[in-house]
Amino acid sequence: MVMSLRAGYRAALSLWILSSFICRAWTAPSTFQKCDEPLISGLPHVSFSSSSSLSSSYAPGYAKINKRGGAGGWSPSDSDHYQWLQVDFGNRKQISAIATQGRYSSSDWVTQYRMLYSDTGRNWKPYHQDGNIWAFPGNINSDSVVRHDLQHAVVARYVRIVPLDWNGEGHIGLRAEVYGCAYWADVINFDGHGVLPYRFRNKKMKTLKDVIALKFKTSESEGVLLHGEGQQGDYITLELKKAKLVLSLNLGSNQLGPIYGHTSVTSGSLLDDHHWHSVLIERQGRSINLTLDRSMQHFRTNGEFDYLDLDYEITFGGIPFSGKPSSSNRKNFKGCMESINYNGVNITDLARRKKLGPSNMGNLSFSCVEPYTVPVFFNATSYLEVPGRLNQDLFSVSFQFRTWNPSGLLLFSHFADNLGNVEIDLVESKVGVHINNTQTKTSQIDISSGSGLNDGQWHEVRFLAKENFAVLTIDGDEASAVRTNSPLQVKTGEKYFFGGFLNHMNNASYSALQPSFQGCMQLIQVDDQLVNLYEVAQRKPGSFANVTIDMCAIIDRCVPNHCEHGGKCSQTWDSFKCTCDETGYSGATCHNSIYEPSCEAYKHLGQTSNYYWIDPDGSGPLGPLKVYCNMTEDKVWTIVSHDLQMQTTVVGYNPEKYSVTQLIYSASMDQISAITSSAEYCEQYVSYFCRMSRLLNTPDGSPYTWWVGKANEKHYYWGGSEPGIQKCACGIERNCTDPKYYCNCDADYKQWRKDAGFLSYKDHLPVSQVVVGDTDRQGSEAKLSVGPLRCQGDRNYWNAASFPNPSSYLHFSTFQGETSADISFYFKTLIPRGVFLENLGNTDFIKLELKSATEVSFSFDVGNGPVEIVVRSPSPLNDDQWHRVTAERNVKQASLQVDRLPQQIRKAPTEGHTRLELYSQLFVGGAGGQQGFLGCIRSLRMNGVTLDLEERAKVTSGFKSGCSGHCTSYGANCENGGKCIEKYHGYSCDCSNTAYDGTFCNKDVGAFFEEGMWLRYNFQAPAVTARDTGSRAENSADQQQHLAPDLAQEQIHFSFSTTKAPCILLYVSSLTTDFLAVLVKPTGNLQIRYNLGGTREPFNIDVDHRNMANGQPHSVNITRHERTIILKLDHYPAVGYHLPSSSDTLFNSPKSLFLGKVIETGKIDQEIHKYNTPGFTGCLSRVQFNHIAPLKAALRQTNASAHVHIQGELVESNCGASPLTLSPMSSATDPWHLDHLDSASADFPYNPGQGQAIRNGVNRNSAIIGGVIAVVIFTILCTLVFLIRYMFRHKGTYHTNEAKGAESAESADAAIMNNDPNFTETIDESKKEWLI
């Protein structure tokens, strides 16, 4: 519907944008002309003025650079911080540089100064750089010239130089030059009533591109700068709201559909300072650049449309009243604009030449009207003393203030005749008045009003007090004014102190006063008289300290916002703070992700399969996402879910009317792209069940079905096939139902067929859309399912390069980290020093190096001088182990951390350079003749981007990609005797010689034994010939154990649980009379029996202190070396035992190992024979005899499986024992705990273990639910058995307990359900099919 409306305007004018530089004033200097002319040297003496002069020979007119007239320059009468030199250029100039020189041949020069500028000689603005009021370094002698090129040019008629420091052995002395060029622009003054319209020639304007530029200045916080709208709902509005710039744009919405095009972006702050601000709007379709005072914001509009359709006109300065909602409740702009350009049209020039046609321009004029207000700027040690009228019965004061601080002293004044004093404070962002009255019973009167008054906006305070009455009004809100009728006597004093109190700094008796005010004040009225601040500046009358009159230099330190990733910025006068709660990031500027970058990283922290938050680009812009990490294999699977994993039925669609199935993932496409890019392999399962529904229409037809992947590209192949081949899996394998076709479904059979398989070309994944178009015929039907995206491996985590010699290095493009930079990597080396990386600028640099065997250094310079942070380790770092280095630098601080050593932090100066400007290439491994790095570096990430060390090493001579020796650092992760195996990308754990399984050999392998079941493992002991000895010299230890016929030692450990005693747990027989047995006696006590010969009776170890047949899992660990036996049971301390001295020390010729029951020919010990029937019932796990794991050999296909014989069917179980893993963190300190940030991402049901659709939508929690229900049902059944036995305990008695409603019920179950509604729920639950 909307598209049809838009089609009617296809004949509208298509605008060609001339160039982007038209956005500047048409008379501004060309970008090809250097703006660097001296502006002071040709000026007459009358163009100079100053705060004072030592004499006429030191007049300001002599302050010209390299001139020797008069006394050789300007010097004031006093050398203090209230002196200044001012120059009037006669008209506005564009200023690009400033230079200073001391007074000729003297000891008078300025070492530091500020530059203020203005259009009118009033309302001065200090030059800003790097977010601070800039202090320029001055001279070191009287003759040399020090020049500074401005970081950004300024436009002004007046320049004022304010010395901050000077030569301590002399006085202030100054000669100066300012460089720039002429500037002129058309200016229009708006009075707040009239608007400036630009009407379109054809009454309509349809644009794909727009470039709109203007400059404005105002003292109002609200006002519309420009507005245009169309009848289709399109509009564009640029306005001020609370002194911030707001751009609102709508390229089209659909009131009957989901398209909502409204977009609003806010920029800037404190724009009501009556200084010029430049705005540039560049639009290309939905892509917008909004630039305010050199700070650019890029964004995309909402909706789906690209053209802006405006009708009739676009207006500047306000919205003409039309009765529409857009024209009401919006103030017109009051202030000045210049250089208004709309798509190449100079609006201000047309207005000046009266070429805009009839309009309601109102009282527009072409010169800027300046405000009458005079601001005062206070710092932490300021005060302003204003005289008042003495002994008045009415105390009346009003003023406006703006600040960021929540507290500060606004006003203090003594009453006459010792009646007390009045104090007005800002306390916790409220204005409070405290009256101390010494002549009344109520000595203290406190009232307060307002809230949130430290927001940087102008706020008005009016306070009036007279006898027995006082009223406080904030921002003119009379309805909220606070009044008091407390007893009060008033007689005004002769002095009013604003912003601070003179005695507050010199007299401890006033220590209860609030800290001095930091901010600006204006429109100060005392006793109903407006204070003339220019007279106060000349100290006639009044006085001040450390204030600047006619300037408000308040800075919004949250604009631009240095808090990243949605962190909330708050500020005081001289600093800002970032609140990172619920962002997923931490640090001073919310720069660092609290999550690991991949599932691979979680695996190496000892975590197990579960849902985790990952952040693939770390500190980058993508943000965290929640995925399932499957860690049951050597390589970790990362699984991303979507909302279409249940089978979807599609009917009634044809090639002209397709069924479009959109998949919504639990992550954005950019986040998923980051996962697939770093993965080694990705796959996604697709399945198409069909009945008379063709799929790809092979071999020669146009596909009826296709899928859309990354970058919205269509793909015409199906699961199991490859890109560019219009086939299904059966077409590749040549086993389709009908060999004439390449897909089973293309045969168009009436019977159900299926085409399914994995899509594995990761550059095309994920599947975002599936289109089906052949289900509209009679009997046609298709069932579609798409599994989750599964990716394996992490190329970034193991991305490494070996540095073969100290003179070698890899180079990359310049590191971009002007205001925020983070660097992290792993290294290992054997040398004590070397440069990890370095990047240089003209004077700036950044470097990380190993300074010594125990020191890592992070050094940089952003223009304030070199800074170095060093972390010292108590142990050597050149130990050929992996060590992690993390360095960060932002506008607030810099930090360095090595491994888990304490982080070292260095705060940034509150004023100074903040941007790191680098130009050279980034060198990794050393450069510039320095001591290079020798060793290995991996996983090098800079601002969230992993540098591909491997690829760069492959194309650089003398380098080797990858690193070896991972097991030296990570071998300890292989638990329970697992062996660490080196791999090109990382390592793996070989669990073949252990009784455990899993990635880190920490997963129990066990089985449940039913009564009568048994397992036998037969030992082999072939003779070892002399010839075999040499060939088997390198055989593993477990093979040697197998070959050894006699054993001088055994290591046995296992876990078991049972409720039945007696039983045999483990028995080892021999070809002689030797045996070993572990059994549970009838009392439940554990007994170990050893018979090695030499004794009449077997040696017994009885553990009598507890019942082991209690159904709980128990761990048994037995170690024998000759005659010494060590037994460790559960968590109890190990206990030592000794075989009799007559006993042999060898276990001769071991034959078989039995679990559960002994089935052995020949003579068996009587105790064993007595306890051998009926056999063990329960669970056994972790069974290991030396290097033999019999249960694992039975349940897994290993080399030892041929030695195993089983009676009965083993059911695998871990016997309720928890996997042996690293100790888990608490939920309070675990950053990837599931409860954290659950609202940030959607969860969709799927089975992560299988990686394909769950048909009935049952997720992994069903196992837990099913287990709980099973326990509940078991409890209910036990209770019913008890009740039945109780009810039938009387013999010869007959009771009937028929359920009500049995007559009408069809069955007994129905009768029970009719009678007991709660039972219905139980039956329903039991009938559910749970996936466990």
Curated annotation (Swiss-Prot):
Q: What happens when the gene is disrupted?
A: Mutants don't show difference of Ranvier nodes length and width compared to wild-type littermates. Double mutants CNTNAP1 and CNTNAP2 have wider Ranvier nodes.
User: One GO biological process from the UniProt record?
Assistant: intracellular signal transduction
Membrane topology summary: Single-pass type I membrane protein
Q: Does the keyword Membrane apply?
A: yes
GO cellular component terms listed in the entry, alphabetical order: axolemma; axon; axon initial segment; cell surface; cerebellar granule cell to Purkinje cell synapse; dendrite; early endosome; excitatory synapse
One of the Pfam families matching this protein, by short name: Laminin_G_2
In this chain the Laminin G-like domain maps to 187-368, 373-552, 799-963, 1023-1214
For side Extracellular, which residue ranges? 28-1262
Q: Where are the transmembrane segments?
A: 1263-1283
Q: What are the protein's UniProt keywords?
A: Cell adhesion, Cell junction, Cell projection, Disulfide bond, EGF-like domain, Glycoprotein, Membrane, Phosphoprotein, Repeat, Signal, Transmembrane, Transmembrane helix
Q: Which InterPro entries has this protein been placed in? A: ConA-like_dom_sf, EGF-like_dom, FA58C, Fibrinogen-like_C, Fibrinogen_a/b/g_C_dom, Galactose-bd-like_sf, Laminin_G, Neurexin-like
**Cysteine disulfide links:** C35-C181, C336-C368, C520-C552, C558-C569, C563-C578, C580-C590, C936-C963, C967-C980, C974-C989, C991-C1001, C1179-C1215
Q: Which SMART domains match?
A: 4.1m, EGF, FA58C, LamG
Q: Which residues carry this modification: Phosphoserine?
A: S1304, S1307
Which residues are modified by glycosylation?
N289, N346, N363, N379, N436, N507, N546, N630, N735, N1117, N1199
Q: Which residues lie on this side of the membrane: Cytoplasmic?
A: 1284-1332
Which parts of the sequence belong to the Fibrinogen C-terminal domain?
592-798
Q: One MF term from GO for this chain?
A: PDZ domain binding
Give the function comment from the record. Required for gap junction formation. Required, with CNTNAP1, for radial and longitudinal organization of myelinated axons. Plays a role in the formation of functional distinct domains critical for saltatory conduction of nerve impulses in myelinated nerve fibers. Demarcates the juxtaparanodal region of the axo-glial junction.
On subunit structure and binding partners, the annotation says:
Interacts (via C-terminus) with KCNA2. Interacts with GPR37.
Family membership noted in the UniProt record: Belongs to the neurexin family.
Q: What is this protein called?
A: Contactin-associated protein-like 2
Organism from which the protein derives:
Mus musculus (Mouse)
